[in-house]
Curated annotation (Swiss-Prot):
<dbReference type="GO" id="GO:0005829">
    <property type="term" value="C:cytosol"/>
</dbReference>
<dbReference type="InterPro" id="IPR029063">
    <property type="entry name" value="SAM-dependent_MTases_sf"/>
</dbReference>
<keyword id="KW-0489">Methyltransferase</keyword>
<feature type="binding site">
    <location>
        <position position="82"/>
    </location>
    <ligand>
        <name>S-adenosyl-L-methionine</name>
    </ligand>
</feature>
<comment type="function">
    <text>Specifically methylates the N7 position of guanine in position 535 of 16S rRNA.</text>
</comment>
<dbReference type="GO" id="GO:0070043">
    <property type="term" value="F:rRNA (guanine-N7-)-methyltransferase activity"/>
</dbReference>
<feature type="binding site">
    <location>
        <position position="77"/>
    </location>
    <ligand>
        <name>S-adenosyl-L-methionine</name>
    </ligand>
</feature>
<protein>
    <recommendedName>
        <fullName>Ribosomal RNA small subunit methyltransferase G</fullName>
        <ecNumber>2.1.1.-</ecNumber>
    </recommendedName>
</protein>
<feature type="binding site">
    <location>
        <begin position="128"/>
        <end position="129"/>
    </location>
    <ligand>
        <name>S-adenosyl-L-methionine</name>
    </ligand>
</feature>
<dbReference type="Pfam" id="PF02527">
    <property type="entry name" value="GidB"/>
</dbReference>
<keyword id="KW-0808">Transferase</keyword>
<comment type="similarity">
    <text>Belongs to the methyltransferase superfamily. RNA methyltransferase RsmG family.</text>
</comment>
<feature type="binding site">
    <location>
        <position position="147"/>
    </location>
    <ligand>
        <name>S-adenosyl-L-methionine</name>
    </ligand>
</feature>
<keyword id="KW-0963">Cytoplasm</keyword>
<keyword id="KW-0949">S-adenosyl-L-methionine</keyword>
<dbReference type="InterPro" id="IPR003682">
    <property type="entry name" value="rRNA_ssu_MeTfrase_G"/>
</dbReference>
<keyword id="KW-0698">rRNA processing</keyword>
Length: 238
């Protein structure tokens, strides 16, 4: 998917990118490749692959969930900024917070935000477990996203505490995670969440499967969650 095909594909979904936004994506790609030589940000560096598997894939969440209705989003473990930075470029009104435990990624994201001229973006170098216990962030976000390989039960403990009551947690998975979801149901309920939607689709060109799960926050998360750093991964609630 080259930049023009990317622009056309988004237009077909109702997202019309301006010349400025296209330039932001171009600069994002160039910075990603340049910085990737110094630090391991991504295994994907071919232009067509980046536009498809990073940019388009990140934005695909907005085809199924109305992002114009959100004000604040938090991206947990965003790495090189996916999915939240491509979404922010398309929906500039969003206030975006990214939390990641690797300092070098924060350095990249700071430089990226400056280069792209992004406002209302904040980067936090922290463990998700600690961040979720921070009163300045706990239950403060309209939407929390995770595009991660961690199991659903682990992601639920790291992310649901950050969602405000009435807000949503959006999980982006490659393969369908029905079995994973069944195992995680106990944890999701315990943390105050309820699964309300599941969207399954094929990424264009390569036709690989993608899945989006929407979990609404119906009640507050008990104070003891998330547990200490490392515990959710070692001893997931299942």
């Amino acid at each position: 998917m080259n930049p023009e095909q990317f622009k056309t594909a988004l237009a077909e979904k109702g997202i019309e990118l301006s010349a400025t936004q296209m330039k932001q994506f171009h600069d994002y790609f160039e910075m990603l490749v340049e910085w990737n030589e110094k630090m391991n940000l991504t295994a994907i560096t071919d232009e067509k692959e980046v536009y498809l598997k990073h940019f388009y894939d990140s934005i695909s969440a907005t085809f199924y969930v109305d992002f114009t209705s959100f004000d604040s989003i938090c991206d947990v473990g965003a790495g090189a900024g996916f999915p939240s930075i491509p979404i922010k470029i398309c929906f500039p009104h969003l206030k975006v917070s990214i939390v990641d435990s690797l300092k070098k990624r924060m350095t990249f994201l700071d430089a990226l935000a400056e280069k792209l001229g992004l406002t209302d973006v904040h980067f936090y170098h922290d463990r998700a477990e600690t961040f979720g216990q921070n009163k300045a962030h706990r239950e403060k976000y309209d939407l929390v996203t995770a595009r991660a390989v961690a199991r659903m039960s682990v992601l639920a403990e790291l992310c649901i505490p950050l969602v405000k009551k009435g807000g949503s947690f959006l999980v982006m998975k490659a393969a369908q995670a029905e079995q994973e979801l069944q195992i995680a149901e106990k944890a999701i309920k315990l943390f105050g969440g309820k699964v309300v939607d599941h969207f399954s689709f094929l990424l264009p060109v390569e036709e690989s499967e993608r899945n989006i799960y929407v979990i609404n926050k119906t009640k507050e998360t008990p104070n003891k969650y998330p547990r200490k750093p490392g515990t959710p991964n070692k001893l997931p609630i299942e």
